[in-house]
């Protein structure tokens, strides 16, 4: 049997990976974002009160965009993703959480 699993839901069994289970079972969602190009910072504010921090330069489409374009984002997937229509860029809560966990586990400083 050929599985169609790709870094997320295993569509052959409709099962979620650990991060997706956490996001959906706990109801974790992106509430808003705060962008600071001068500090190379993207803050992801969660409905839980938590804040995730990413380097804007980690995302070339965002890093090279104007502040005007950066402000024109939409939360998608009921707060599980962010879309910038003008930039054709999509980022996910799952990706942010995965990167945060990886960086904390391996002691990387952002």
Language model segments and positions:
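Motif-centric detector for short Cys/His coordination patterns
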Residues: 1-110
């Amino acid at each position: 049997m050929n599985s169609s699993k790709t870094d997320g839901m295993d569509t052959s069994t409709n099962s979620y990976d650990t991060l997706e289970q956490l996001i959906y079972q706990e109801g974790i969602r992106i509430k808003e974002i705060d962008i600071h190009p001068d500090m190379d910072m993207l803050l992801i504010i969660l409905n839980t009160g938590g804040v995730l921090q990413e380097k804007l330069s980690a995302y070339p489409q965002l890093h090279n965009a104007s502040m005007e374009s950066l402000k024109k984002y939409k939360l998608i997937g009921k707060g599980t993703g962010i879309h910038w229509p003008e930039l054709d860029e999509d980022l996910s809560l799952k990706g942010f959480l995965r990167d945060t966990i990886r960086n904390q586990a391996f002691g990387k400083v952002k």
